[in-house]
């Protein structure tokens, strides 16, 4: 029995005495304790060593007092499981080989046994659940198919996604085939994370805003919908968050994926989002991560503004406080602690 289930209750739009808070990338470089672990190993080895992944997953729970933990991993483990070589090169970025550009390339990708290929993630989840000892829920996650597709086709990050879009526009059937192959792997991966002990799931579509609204509806949303449906078919009680970065103009479509919660970027007023979606999903967000460079007073005033904009809770509303994207690596940890403590205290008046 979880000692603190506020996060899960908020996702299900059940009443809570205050607004729960966690932040994306909360296990990361801004923490000296994380850097101490990271100095001893490279990033992917850290992801693949359950004891280390568990240690850094729990750090922000111990040090910052957040209301949920998120398993330490990377979205590109799915691409690697499908047969791509993934390298994360310090100061140079991400390189995936081979780039997936042809039918033959797609055919060579495997439909992996996720238990075999991604067992280290499930081991890390099991170990973390044990070590958390029911203090807070644990979030499992995956990248969305569109975002993983862009990495596969581009062979890394991209400024304009030219190769990914070339495939979309010239060979749409091929693009859909690759997206479907990735989606099947994601669904299996998410279900196994829940089986290992994840209490909730987040799907990150980091490069969502590279697409127009219509293209997002065609090449991204149907696959997210499949992932949500797969998790819900196996585990109807497990809440799913969809974070489609900066797709503020089609929030209603994102909510229609069947997700319990929609993650918001910082460039939308949360009051507008709540009004548009009319409390049919929980909202997660949405402070600009750079606010954490500010003074404690500024951090508190910005957090207070978001809580006030969301407004008074009803018996069917839900809000999880978060940033609009990941915490930046050079933020002072004391500033995040200030935010967490303030949100816990200030939010009670709206419940």
Swiss-Prot record:
Gene3D superfamilies xref list: 3.20.20.210
Residues under site feature: Transition state stabilizer: 74
Top-level enzyme category: lyase
Record GO biological process: protoporphyrinogen IX biosynthetic process
Keyword Metal-binding listed: no
Transmembrane region(s): none
Main location: cytoplasm
GO cellular component: cytosol
Binding-site residues, substrate: 25-29, 74, 151, 206, 325
Pathway: Porphyrin-containing compound metabolism; protoporphyrin-IX biosynthesis; coproporphyrinogen-III from 5-aminolevulinate: step 4/4
Sorted UniProt keywords: Cytoplasm, Decarboxylase, Lyase, Porphyrin biosynthesis
Xref: Pfam families: URO-D
Molecular-function annotations in GO: uroporphyrinogen decarboxylase activity
UniProt record similarity statement: Belongs to the uroporphyrinogen decarboxylase family.
Assembly and oligomerization: Homodimer.
Annotated function: Catalyzes the decarboxylation of four acetate groups of uroporphyrinogen-III to yield coproporphyrinogen-III.
Name by which UniProt lists this protein: Uroporphyrinogen decarboxylase
Gene: hemE
